[in-house]
Amino acid sequence: MARVTDKITHLIELVIKDMCYELVGIEYVASGKHSILRVFIDTDKKGVGVNDCEKVSRQLSSIFDVEEPISGQYTLEVSSPGIERPLFHKEHYQRFLGANVKLRMVRPIDGRRNFFGVIGCVNEADNTFELVGELDLVILDIDLIEKANLVVDF
């Protein structure tokens, strides 16, 4: 799956940037005959609305019709990251330092795959960050995270 998302990221990153949006990240869910491609966009101006998503979706659909980065049928979903924003890159962890996050690792660490805590210090050199939980502090490798989302504290 990483190859598919890498290929798509390379294909659309500049297009989205030229449209004055930030490509937050991509999720590709292969599901039998029909897959889902989720593209998360943002902007630092006013946030992302339905019209923004529609505009980007049309542009990406045109590109995908020509380039065909995904074989078989798929649904393209373009959306804002929302308040429980997904985290994809090291820069996201740096940007949301001190925020609550829930995440799932690719493989267990000390018998656990699911973690919840506060994003602590990010170490750029080895691509890790500290996750401060209620009872412990864990150092996690960003490359080994399957899925991570901010958690809103009301």
UniProtKB/Swiss-Prot annotation:
Chief subcellular location: cytoplasm
Highest taxon in the source lineage: Bacteria
InterPro entries registered for this protein in UniProt: Ribosome_maturation_RimP, RimP_C, RimP_C_sf, RimP_N, RimP_N_sf
Biological process, per Gene Ontology: ribosomal small subunit assembly; translation
Cell division among keywords: no
Record keywords, A-Z: Cytoplasm, Ribosome biogenesis
Cellular component terms (Gene Ontology): cytosol
Compartments reported by the entry: Cytoplasm
Pfam families: DUF150_C, RimP_N
Gene3D superfamilies: Ribosome maturation factor RimP, C-terminal domain, RimP-like superfamily, N-terminal
Keyword Chloroplast included in the entry's annotation: no
Database matches in HAMAP family: RimP
Similarity field: Belongs to the RimP family.
Functional summary from the UniProt entry: Required for maturation of 30S ribosomal subunits.
Protein name: Ribosome maturation factor RimP
